[in-house]
C-alpha cells in the first residue's frame, strides 16, 4: 500500500486502541487517506463514524459525543479553512476540559509559503488553546523502514491521546494532531495478504499511560457557618453532602440540602467551599468576592477559579472536622423554601409566558434517567431559578466559555453518546430520553447542526425545546436592557429575526410542532421517534418586570 494510506491506517488503529470510539469526519481531498481508514474502521464495527459537511458544527458534535461518553473523540478534516472552523469548539473544549482531538490533514510542508492552493500554516494555529500540537512527518516510500515508521507513528498517536485525556496532567482538553499527506491520497490496488503494520498484541496501545493520581487534601472546619458553591466540572464530595449547596445545573448533586441561588443574599455565611468553576448567578459572584468570607477551592484538576483573588486555599478534596450548626442548616433550608416559593408564586401571577415559564415546565417534566442539554444563555440560568431537581438526571451545557455556538450539535452528540451507552448496558429497544432546552437565537445560530445525512447515525430519542422570544432575552436582564436604552436595545442587542422555526426544521426533514407552555409536559411524555423540535412562543419584553417581582417577593 502507498505511504499515506499506510500512515493513516496506523494512526486510526492506534487511536482506537487508545479508547476512541466515535469520530466525526468532514469531507475533503487532502484527508482522503484518513477518510478511507475511518470508513474501514466503521464498517468493521471498531468505531462509529459521523460524516458532517460543516466543520464548525462537526466540532461541537464531537464535544457532545465526548462529554456524553466521557471519552476522547476525534474530528477529522482537510487542510486550510476547514481547520480554522474548529476554532470555537477548540476554545470550548479547552476551558471545559473536553478530550477533543482535531485530526487535520495538511499539505506537504515544503508547499508552505509557495502560494499552493488550500495551504496555510495550520500547525500551531490554535496556539494556547490546545494541550499540545503534534505533527507527523511525511510518510516515506521506504519498505525497509516500515517497522521504525510504524513505531514513530504509533508513539506520536499515544502522546496525542495522553495529552487529550490528561493522563499525565489530570487536565484533559483539546489536542491538534496535524498530518501532512503526499499523493497518492487514495489506496492502491493491494496485493493479496497486504496488512497494516501491527500494533501491540491483544489490541493494547503502543505506549500505555496510566491516569495520573491528583490528590491534594485540604483541612476544612465545618463548624463555621458554611455554604458550598458547586459549579461546572465539580467533583462529588460525600463528606460535604450535609452542607447547604448552591449547585449549578451541570454540577453533580451529592447532598439533600440544596440552596436556591436567590437565597444567598438573605444569608450571612462565614466561609465558602467552592467546587469546580462557578459560571452562573450574580449573588454567587458577589459572595465569592466578599473579602470577609474565606473561600476554599476544591477542583478535579490543576487549575482553580478565583476571579476575585479571594481564595484562601485550594485542593482536590476536603478533610473535614466539626459539624454544621443545626440552626444554620435550618435557616438555610427555610431561605431555600422561601426563594423557591417566591419564584413559583411570581411565575403563576405573571400574565405572559416567558423563557422562565418554559424552563419551569421542562424541569417539571423531567424524570430520572433523562439527559438534559441546556443552552448557555438564559436556559441554564432559568432552570436553576426554577429549582430543577437534578437527582437521576444528566445535565449538560457548554460552560467552558459559555457561548451559544454549536448547541444543537452538542445536543445531538450527547444524545448519540447517551443512547450508545444505554445500548451497551441496557435495553436497545427503549432508548433514554435526551431533552435540549435552548433559546431561539441559539437554535438559529446552529440550525445547520440539524443537517444529518441519510446514511449517518441519528438520535433515537432527542427533543429540542426552543423557547422562542424572537431575540436575545438575556439582554433584557442586563444593563443593556435598562429602559434608558429602549429606543435602540431591541435592534442591537435583542436582534429580532422573525425566523419560521417550523419551516427551518422542514428544510432539514426534522419533525417540529409549535405548542403552548402548558402542553410541554404531556407532549414530552409522548414518545417521539428520532429527533423532533418543540417550539414554545415566549415574551421577553416583560422579563425585567418578572425578575423584579421575584426579587421584591424575597
UniProtKB/Swiss-Prot annotation:
Cofactor note: Binds 1 thiamine pyrophosphate per subunit.
Keyword Nucleotide-binding (UniProt): no
Short name of any one Pfam family annotated for the protein: TPP_enzyme_N
Catalytic activity: isochorismate + 2-oxoglutarate + H(+) = 5-enolpyruvoyl-6-hydroxy-2-succinyl-cyclohex-3-ene-1-carboxylate + CO2
Principal EC category: transferase
Cofactor: Mg(2+); Mn(2+); thiamine diphosphate
CDD domains according to UniProt: TPP_PYR_MenD, TPP_SHCHC_synthase
InterPro entries the record matches: MenaQ_synth_MenD, THDP-binding, Thiamin_PyroP_enz_TPP-bd_dom
Associated pathway: Quinol/quinone metabolism; 1,4-dihydroxy-2-naphthoate biosynthesis; 1,4-dihydroxy-2-naphthoate from chorismate: step 2/7; Quinol/quinone metabolism; menaquinone biosynthesis
MF terms in GO: 2-succinyl-5-enolpyruvyl-6-hydroxy-3-cyclohexene-1-carboxylic-acid synthase activity; magnesium ion binding; manganese ion binding; thiamine pyrophosphate binding
Record carries keyword Transmembrane helix: no
Subunit structure as annotated in this protein's UniProt entry: Homodimer.
Stated name of the protein: 2-succinyl-5-enolpyruvyl-6-hydroxy-3-cyclohexene-1-carboxylate synthase
Native source species: Mycobacterium tuberculosis (strain CDC 1551 / Oshkosh)
Amino acid at each position: 500500500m502507498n505511504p499515506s494510506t499506510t500512515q493513516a491506517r496506523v494512526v486510526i488503529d492506534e487511536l482506537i486502541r487508545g479508547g476512541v470510539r466515535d469520530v466525526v469526519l468532514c469531507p475533503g481531498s487532502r484527508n482522503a487517506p484518513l477518510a478511507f481508514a475511518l470508513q474501514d474502521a466503521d464498517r468493521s464495527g471498531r468505531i462509529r463514524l459521523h460524516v458532517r459537511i460543516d466543520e464548525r458544527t462537526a466540532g461541537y458534535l464531537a464535544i457532545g459525543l465526548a462529554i456524553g461518553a466521557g471519552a476522547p473523540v476525534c474530528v477529522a478534516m482537510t487542510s486550510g479553512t476547514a481547520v480554522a472552523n474548529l476554532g470555537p469548539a477548540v476554545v470550548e473544549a479547552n476551558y471545559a476540559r473536553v478530550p477533543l482531538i482535531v485530526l487535520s490533514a495538511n499539505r506537504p510542508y515544503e508547499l508552505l509559503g509557495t502560494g499552493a492552493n488550500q495551504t496555510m500554516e495550520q500547525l500551531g494555529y490554535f496556539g494556547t488553546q490546545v494541550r499540545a500540537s503534534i505533527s507527523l512527518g511525511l510518510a516515506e516510500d521506504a519498505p525497509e523502514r516500515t517497522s521504525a515508521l510504524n513505531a514513530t507513528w504509533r508513539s506520536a498517536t499515544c502522546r496525542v491521546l495522553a495529552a487529550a485525556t490528561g493522563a499525565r496532567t489530570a487536565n484533559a482538553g483539546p489536542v491538534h494532531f496535524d498530518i501532512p499527506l503526499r499523493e497518492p491520497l487514495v489506496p492502491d490496488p493491494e496485493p493479496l495478504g497486504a496488512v497494516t503494520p501491527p500494533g501491540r498484541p491483544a489490541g493494547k496501545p503502543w505506549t500505555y499511560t496510566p491516569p495520573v493520581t491528583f490528590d491534594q487534601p485540604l483541612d476544612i472546619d465545618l463548624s463555621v457557618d458554611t455554604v458550598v458553591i458547586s459549579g461546572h466540572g465539580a467533583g462529588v464530595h460525600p463528606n460535604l453532602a450535609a452542607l447547604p449547596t448552591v449547585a449549578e445545573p451541570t454540577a453533580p448533586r451529592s447532598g439533600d440540602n440544596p440552596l436556591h441561588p436567590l437565597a444567598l443574599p438573605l444569608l450571612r455565611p462565614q466561609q465558602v467551599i467552592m467546587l469546580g468553576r462557578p459560571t452562573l448567578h450574580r449573588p454567587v459572584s458577589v459572595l465569592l468576592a466578599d473579602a470577609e468570607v474565606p473561600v476554599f477551592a476544591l477542583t478535579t484538576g490543576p487549575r482553580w477559579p478565583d476571579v476575585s483573588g479571594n481564595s484562601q486555599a485550594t485542593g482536590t478534596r476536603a478533610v473535614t472536622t466539626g459539624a454544621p450548626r443545626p440552626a444554620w442548616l435550618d435557616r438555610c433550608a427555610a431561605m431555600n423554601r422561601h426563594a423557591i416559593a417566591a419564584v413559583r408564586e411570581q411565575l403563576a401571577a405573571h400574565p405572559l409566558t416567558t423563557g422562565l415559564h418554559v424552563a419551569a415546565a421542562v424541569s417539571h417534566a423531567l424524570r430520572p434517567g433523562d439527559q438534559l442539554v441546556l443552552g448557555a444563555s438564559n436556559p441554564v440560568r432559568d432552570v436553576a431559578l426554577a429549582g430543577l431537581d437534578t437527582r437521576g438526571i444528566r445535565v449538560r451545557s457548554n460552560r467552558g466559555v459559555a457561548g451559544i455556538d454549536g448547541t444543537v450539535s452538542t445536543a445531538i452528540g450527547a444524545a448519540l453518546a447517551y443512547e450508545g451507552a444505554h445500548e451497551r448496558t441496557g435495553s436497545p429497544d427503549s432508548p433514554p430520553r435526551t431533552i435540549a432546552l435552548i433559546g431561539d437565537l441559539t437554535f438559529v445560530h446552529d440550525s445547520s447542526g440539524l443537517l444529518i445525512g441519510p446514511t449517518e447515525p441519528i438520535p433515537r430519542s432527542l427533543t429540542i425545546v426552543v423557547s422562542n422570544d424572537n431575540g436575545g432575552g438575556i439582554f433584557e436582564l442586563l444593563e443593556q436592557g435598562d429602559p434608558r436604552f429602549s429606543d435602540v436595545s431591541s435592534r442591537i442587542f435583542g436582534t429580532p429575526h422573525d425566523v419560521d422555526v417550523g419551516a427551518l426544521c422542514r428544510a432539514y426533514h426534522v419533525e417540529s410542532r409549535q405548542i403552548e407552555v402548558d402542553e410541554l409536559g404531556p407532549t414530552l411524555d409522548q414518545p417521539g421517534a428520532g429527533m423532533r423540535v418543540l417550539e414554545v412562543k415566549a415574551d421577553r419584553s416583560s422579563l425585567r418586570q418578572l425578575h423584579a417581582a421575584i426579587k421584591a417577593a424575597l
